[in-house]
């Protein structure tokens, strides 16, 4: 009998949400996604000890204030993790723009371009990379510009249809609507448990997927942030799903039948709309869950980025002693 993971691969592009080199080599996903939390975890493994030494040695040769140097070294380390993953997957690796730039379009553009240039310096072309940006109004505007420059983007921390519509308007390459974090919010808010079919995160991604397919929107829908295998199974057939190694392993061990839940052919009419800035901000204001989870996600990624920069500062100080 074929595993559910293999059945899923027949209808959905499977992406690994990890920086764990061994897991990626074993599970053989098409793409990989990273974020500051994943980069920080990867750098804590022996596999990246040499990369840390190299980045710190490079940092010692850089001028400028200590904060700028530590930020540049942190960027270099994130690229090191991404470059290692690129060697293991046939597709793309997502690298995230600093979370503390989520409300600054111009700074996000500068950072994204520098990430692409850093990969280029390592012989990795832009067609192997996705630039991850938070789905704020400013992040979406940055993505719109980058897409016109031939830099494909992955819009993350997406919790609402308003964000998905704005991303479609901007013609971004890919969106990552979250599932598990939406479920977390509703469970905390209502005190209820939800089956996979009732799961508000699953329902949200299905609605976005249907809207895109109903209107022939080319942006790829990649479900993200899963709490259990049931959520993944409930979105079988989605364009892509980015999944943690633990849940990939669980699906690989399950030889039950996987039913396709999503397909372009099953789309239902859903009139196409566009959103300007004031409409976007109002729709987000009216969606307490999306507003809270977006802000929470940005804070969490910014915290991990600060932790990484602090680690780098300590390494630089030790190297200078």
UniProtKB/Swiss-Prot annotation:
Enzymatic class: transferase
Catalytic reaction equation(s): D-sedoheptulose 7-phosphate + D-glyceraldehyde 3-phosphate = D-erythrose 4-phosphate + beta-D-fructose 6-phosphate
Active-site residues (renumbered): 132 (schiff-base intermediate with substrate)
Annotated transmembrane regions: none
Keyword terms: Cytoplasm, Pentose shunt, Schiff base, Transferase
Pathway the protein contributes to: Carbohydrate degradation; pentose phosphate pathway; D-glyceraldehyde 3-phosphate and beta-D-fructose 6-phosphate from D-ribose 5-phosphate and D-xylulose 5-phosphate (non-oxidative stage): step 2/3
A GO molecular-function descriptor: transaldolase activity
Record's keyword annotation contains Transferase: yes
E.C. number: 2.2.1.2
Biological role: Transaldolase is important for the balance of metabolites in the pentose-phosphate pathway.
Subunit details: Homodimer.
Name the UniProt record assigns to this protein: Transaldolase
Species of origin: Rhizobium etli (strain CIAT 652)
Organism lineage: Bacteria, Pseudomonadati, Pseudomonadota, Alphaproteobacteria, Hyphomicrobiales
